[in-house]
UniProtKB/Swiss-Prot annotation:
One of its GO terms (molecular function) is glutaminase activity. Homotetramer. Pfam families: Glutaminase. This is Glutaminase. It is an enzyme of class 3 (hydrolase). It comes from Methylobacterium sp. (strain 4-46).
Amino acid sequence: MTDLTRVVTEIAEEMRARPDRGEVATYIPELARMDPRAFGMVVIDADGEVAAAGDCDVPFSIQSISKVFTLTLALGMVGDRLWRRVGREPSGSPFNSIVQLEYERGIPRNPFINAGAIAVTDVILSRHQPREALGEILRFLQFLAGDAAIAIDESVAASEQRTGYRNMALANFMKAHGVLDNPVPYLLGVYFHHCAIAMTCRQLAEAGRFLAHSGRHPATGHLVVQPERARRINAVMLTCGHYDGSGEFAYRVGLPGKSGVGGGILAIAPGRASIAVWSPGLDAAGNSHLGRIALEMLTKRLGWSIFGQ
């Protein structure tokens, strides 16, 4: 057993024993069915060594983690023109808040809150029909993860469409301010479905490797994005990736990361590793409770915080 595998295994065992597990998301009915006792973790280092523990091969709804990949696609389509429609600043507000959007005339603070991700999805949809746009997002994730079996959990997507009233309000408000180009029903259909993509920790860690290695996926050698763009995506993940808990995550973990209300977190240790962790119980900000604790333990034990040991 390598040192990396030993550390990951020990952390998973410690997480399994903890009584504090957070609360599963209930506002999306399908997510409320998740087992709060589940925990999985995968770390893939620069040499391709995979350290895996726990429920690392159980698929879960990646939810807002998909926003990392839609941001990457949209930047590839329109470049820095994207930033005319969405900002790069932390919001300090809940991920589905409409208050800030009203003050700022329909321009979302960043691409990782719901309003910002809807605006990013609108850019992708402008190049395609809805089914084609969704297909491009899904194929991109399949390519990055090296696994064509990755698919959308249709029951989760349907659940979101039935109950996504706040997202409908956000989209209609932005549409009224001229921020969105496409019809809101089509746009939200794509948005709900890419948030409902299901992946395992192993697949997600593989998909994120290009961000740990200056935009190049080490498994294939493919340059996914230029090094400068990879750095900037990581920067937005660090400052905005955990909603109004982003500062706490940076303080405790010290890595770029993106969470989802399905309980997943994708974290990037630049030059070192791509990390995926999953535990469905959430904290008050909507981030995985045990996932954040596990990543804090990992960076402390390995000295991987970008701010130093």
